[in-house]
């Protein structure tokens, strides 16, 4: 019997190509989009992911994790900036959400593993799993995956580890995916315009006073 894999699908080309590769290798797969915050792009992501799954004739579902995402990612992000730190919310999201809550959901629902469209590799060395760099070093994402535990690594597949981004796009285009030419996301997903100060101000409902520039000389 084929292994059951739950594929995290953002609606973008990478996760779609990952699902396509797994299906071509005979895995029993299902697509899942995580709804992490309430904005106008989330329904579009769900739509694109579902269209890809329909194209591949695989089941699809979405999972609302807004409360957990706010607790584990957005709130620490705001707190860090207020304390003069520079957070990386993608690392916290991978640790707690994609490879935390989604993996828990997968295992509780009869799946053997999860898969994502990250560019990295997981290799077995002795009795341990090791995270190694992707073939496409310009897209390598090992940095944002570094906190993953042995349990998480053991139950994760990263199908794009040996592909370049161009190869992933080509596979998606060859199968007629609607998102084959979709632009890459560059900014933090919940602050797409990159204006962190305004986001924090609006979220907290407060205005911040300007600080002083100090010359040590």
Regions found by a protein language model. Name each.
Residues 1-146, 157, 166-167, 173:
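ATP-dependent adenylation/nucleotidyltransferase module used to activate substrates
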Residues 115-123, 127-217:
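AMP-forming adenylation/ATP pyrophosphatase catalytic core
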């Amino acid at each position: 019997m084929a292994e059951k894999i739950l594929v995290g699908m953002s609606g973008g080309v990478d996760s779609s190509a990952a699902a396509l590769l797994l299906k071509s290798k005979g895995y029993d797969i299902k697509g899942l989009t995580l709804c992490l915050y309430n904005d106008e792009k989330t329904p579009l992501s769900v739509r694109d992911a579902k269209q890809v799954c329909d194209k591949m004739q695989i089941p699809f579902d979405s999972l609302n994790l807004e409360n957990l995402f706010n607790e584990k990612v957005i709130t620490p992000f705001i707190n860090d900036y207020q304390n003069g730190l520079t957070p990386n919310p993608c690392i916290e999201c991978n640790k707690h959400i994609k490879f935390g809550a989604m993996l828990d959901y997968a295992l509780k629902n009869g799946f053997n593993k999860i898969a994502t469209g990250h560019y990295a590799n997981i290799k077995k060395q002795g009795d341990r799993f090791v995270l190694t760099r992707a073939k496409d070093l310009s897209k390598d994402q090992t940095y944002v995956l570094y906190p993953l535990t042995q349990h998480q690594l053991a139950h994760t597949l990263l199908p794009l580890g040996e592909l370049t981004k161009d190869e992933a796009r080509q596979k998606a285009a060859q199968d007629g995916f609607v998102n084959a030419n979709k632009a890459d996301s560059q900014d933090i997903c919940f602050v797409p315009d990159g204006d962190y100060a305004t986001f924090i101000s609006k979220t907290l409902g407060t205005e911040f006073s300007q600080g002083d520039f100090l010359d040590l000389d």
